[in-house]
């Protein structure tokens, strides 16, 4: 019997103060490095995720980014994703979460929009980097992943709770998508 004891090395982009990468199945025992542009968050690597350092290329078994991609210009997201993919080893996985543009649009057009739509719009931010410059449909995410050389293995829309200042927590929707570098598409959820 062969036991794989190799420790995976994963990168969490924009981890802030609450890293989440170890919640990904199979990554529970991974060595997680964090990357953030804001040194005050105390990441392992201080860098702009739109310009990944060359020394990170082909290094990681996986990359996780929760609510990060929407902070880049819509016109640069394909370039940003390509940079992240360059940091993956062949067969490496990219997992991202982004706010659902479909959900935000429904809320904005409803008679009584949820206060949760504010943080997903282009308002309500806390620092110079916390600005949404893009929103995504699941269709657009699939296109971006495929263009970056990833085979989509999982894609789904989920509900989660978001805190809106002193107003409390409200339900919102986000898209989750996972792709693998250099393998054929496996399934659609």
Regions found by a protein language model. Name each.
Residues 1-5:
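Class I SAM-dependent methyltransferase Rossmann-like catalytic core
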Residues 74-85, 93-187:
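S-adenosyl-L-methionine-dependent methyltransferase catalytic module, highlighting the catalytic core
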Residues 8-106, 177-182:
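Conserved SAM-binding loop
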């Amino acid at each position: 019997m062969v036991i794989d004891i190799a420790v995976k090395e994963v990168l969490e982009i924009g981890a802030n103060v609450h890293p989440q990468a170890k919640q990904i199945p199979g990554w529970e025992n991974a060595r997680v490095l964090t990357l953030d542009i804001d040194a005050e968050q105390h990441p392992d690597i201080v860098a702009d995720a739109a310009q990944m350092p060359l020394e990170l290329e082909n290094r990681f078994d996986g990359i996780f980014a929760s609510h990060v991609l929407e902070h880049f210009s819509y016109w640069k997201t394909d370039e940003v994703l390509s940079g992240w993919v360059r940091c993956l080893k062949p067969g490496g996985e990219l997992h991202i979460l982004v706010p659902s543009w479909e959900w935000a649009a429904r809320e904005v057009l409803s008679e009584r929009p949820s206060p949760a739509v504010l943080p997903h719009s282009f308002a309500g931010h806390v620092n110079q980097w916390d600005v949404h410059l893009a929103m995504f449909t699941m269709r657009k995410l699939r296109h971006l992943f495929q263009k970056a050389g990833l085979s989509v293995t999982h894609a789904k829309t989920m509900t989660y709770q978001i805190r809106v200042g002193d107003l409390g927590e409200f339900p919102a929707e986000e898209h989750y998508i996972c792709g693998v570098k250099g393998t054929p598409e496996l399934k659609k959820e």
